[in-house]
């Protein structure tokens, strides 16, 4: 089964699937739900250290991706939740940086060229500016250690001391990254909305993405997480919901599915009812295909 333009159009739509039993199972699970993109953890996301990937697992992953038509630009690995690339304490920062480099190396071994991550938190111990500089420095160090892999910064909801919820935070990090060809952004619709950027109508989407273009630049958009929100606009709380069941609503997701600016990047569901993923993927694809018919 190969990736067909007629069947999938120009959108890479999928979900964050389980890699239980080995990362080579992830592409199989993605295709089971009708996806032509997927996200995964390449190791346990709640542990600092994982055993190295075995050669047979690497080979099986690559073979399954080739068989099912998943190219590297359709796959969005996510790093460990423990990593804080802007950590104010030297020991935690060093531990985070080493773990992030390991995550990049795992991506490289799997033939993948994107790594999605949450930027970092100042923990109210250093200034926002200092934290953003540490994050950029962490990316630069990872780039020096591992070739090719792109660091894809995920915007956040603004919960606690997490940075990355304002587009200006993302721009400030990118400004300090030396190799700008290897840094990008993953916009999470739930996080964007919770941070205060409205997405409930086509007009609101136009305004929000125009602001992203002005502050960051659409050319840095390398992926999206497609999630509705359980909480209201500007709540600064990260609570995902199934598409159409939350505060954002289907208009936003139809807008993204039909807009060519979001073609050819992973559009990844992290919605809370995995049993609905096949229907959510199908609906997004219907919107997209109707726009190019």
From Swiss-Prot:
Residues reported in the UniProt entry to bind Zn(2+) 3: 191, 238, 240
Presence of keyword Magnesium: no
Name of the protein in question: Probable endonuclease 4
Listed GO biological process terms: base-excision repair
Protein's job: Endonuclease IV plays a role in DNA repair. It cleaves phosphodiester bonds at apurinic or apyrimidinic (AP) sites, generating a 3'-hydroxyl group and a 5'-terminal sugar phosphate.
SS bond list: none
Enzyme class: hydrolase
Binding site for Zn(2+) 1: 78, 118, 154
EC number assigned by the record: 3.1.21.2
CDD domains reported for this sequence: AP2Ec
Cofactor info, note text: Binds 3 Zn(2+) ions.
Residues annotated as binding Zn(2+) 2: 154, 188, 225, 270
SMART domains reported for this sequence: AP2Ec
InterPro entries: AP_endonuc_2 (IPR001719), AP_endonuc_F2_Zn_BS (IPR018246), Xyl_isomerase-like_sf (IPR036237), Xyl_isomerase-like_TIM-brl (IPR013022)
HAMAP family the record matches: Nfo
Reactions accelerated catalytically: Endonucleolytic cleavage to 5'-phosphooligonucleotide end-products
Keywords of the record: DNA damage, DNA repair, Endonuclease, Hydrolase, Metal-binding, Nuclease, Zinc
Cofactor dependence: Zn(2+)
Family membership noted in the UniProt record: Belongs to the AP endonuclease 2 family.
Domain of life: Bacteria
Pfam families: AP_endonuc_2
């Amino acid at each position: 089964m190969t990736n067909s333009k007629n069947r999938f159009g120009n959108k890479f739509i999928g979900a964050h699937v389980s890699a239980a039993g080995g990362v080579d199972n992830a592409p199989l699970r993605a295709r089971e739900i009708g996806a032509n993109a997927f996200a995964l953890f390449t190791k346990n996301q709640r542990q600092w250290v994982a055993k190295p990937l075995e050669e047979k697992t690497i080979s099986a992953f690559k073979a399954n991706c080739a068989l099912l038509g998943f190219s590297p630009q359709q796959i969005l690995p996510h790093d460990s939740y423990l990593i804080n690339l802007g950590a104010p304490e030297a020991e935690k920062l060093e531990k985070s940086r080493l773990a992030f480099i390991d995550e990049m190396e795992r991506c490289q071994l799997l033939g993948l060229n994107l790594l999605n991550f949450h930027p970092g938190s100042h923990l109210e111990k250093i200034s926002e500016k200092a934290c953003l500089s540490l994050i950029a420095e962490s990316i630069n160090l990872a780039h020096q250690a591992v070739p090719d892999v792109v660091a894809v910064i995920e915007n956040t909801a603004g919960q606690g001391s997490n940075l990355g919820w304002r587009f200006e935070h993302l721009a400030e990090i990118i400004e300090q990254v030396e190799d700008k060809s290897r840094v990008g952004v993953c916009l999470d619709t739930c996080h964007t909305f919770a941070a205060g950027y409205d997405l409930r109508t086509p007009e609101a989407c136009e305004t929000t993405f125009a602001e992203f273009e002005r502050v960051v630049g659409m050319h840095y958009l390398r992926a999206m997480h497609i999630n509705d929100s359980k909480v209201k606009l500007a709540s600064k709380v990260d609570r995902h919901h199934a598409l159409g069941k939350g505060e954002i609503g289907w208009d936003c997701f139809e807008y993204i599915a039909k807009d060519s600016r979001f073609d050819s990047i992973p559009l990844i569901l992290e919605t809370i009812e995995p049993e609905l993923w096949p229907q959510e993927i199908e609906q997004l694809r219907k919107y997209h295909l109707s726009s190019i018919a």
